[in-house]
Amino acid sequence: MRKILFVFFMLPVLVFAQKESGDEVYLFSYFKGNGDGLHLAYSYDGFNWKALKNDSIILKPTVGNDKLMRDPCIIRGADGRFHMVWTVSWSEKGIGYASSPDLIHWSEQQYVPVMAQESAARNAWAPEINWDDQLQAYIIYWATTIPGRFPETDSLGDNNHRIYYVSTRDFKHFSDTKLLYEPGFNVIDATIKKVKKDKYIMFLKDETRKPVQKNLRVAFSDSLTGPYGKPGKPITGKYWAEGPTVLKIGDKWIVYFDKYTEHTMGAVTSTDLANWTDISDKVSFPEGTRHGTVFTVTKQEFDKLQQSAIVP
């Protein structure tokens, strides 16, 4: 980052780098309600988020029995295109996928049956996507409950999810589905970031209901596809949190999340990924924002997106 401004917050003091208008722009993909389509918000500082296009739907879902678009995750791929995956249903065994060169013109939507091989699988929730430099492939991962697969925790929640994944290079051919993470409890909403070479951090939700957890934790690995170590203590407070997504500004990591019982968004921050400070009162999002993903675009891409005529 070439130019920075410093914003100071007291009790405790937090210093963040704010990008000027000539640099990249932060975007946040999200859904509203039960998942009517893709919405986008933008920010220049990572704190104040405004709805793009008057909070209009950018893309409507067309795949899956329920035609939902929940938990939209967008990344810029190694090919320069934007790749998006999302939850299509509460109870189907597949996920949605589409790509775009500019967030305006989208490919035909695909239904990817990632858990079709498991006859008892209940769902495929909150998929995320990462590019793996080691495998030279995209890794797509999500949460699924398979009744009886982990009987020791079957009675501790409404479902009993674990994190699974597939890999692909072309979004036409996919690897066999494999288990990505088994932390010893009901887990959903995993998202992974590369910290440095050969070090990855997974943010995840402990979905345990008995006793109630409903918090976010982290686990580390030397590889994107694991194995990941034992999860740490909660990084969120005495509220229910889910749907983490992560942005690094300068040396500060910011984790945004859905405080879904309070119908608002929250955030925590850290410089060392070990000690976390709640800054929920420092961030603002469009009303009704739900679980999504933060990513960056160039100012030129953003200007083109703002000026476009969106036809969902």
For each predicted feature, which ranges?
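Bacterial Sec-dependent N-terminal signal peptides
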Residues: 1-21
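Carbohydrate-active catalytic/glycan-binding domains of CAZyme proteins
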Residues: 17-312
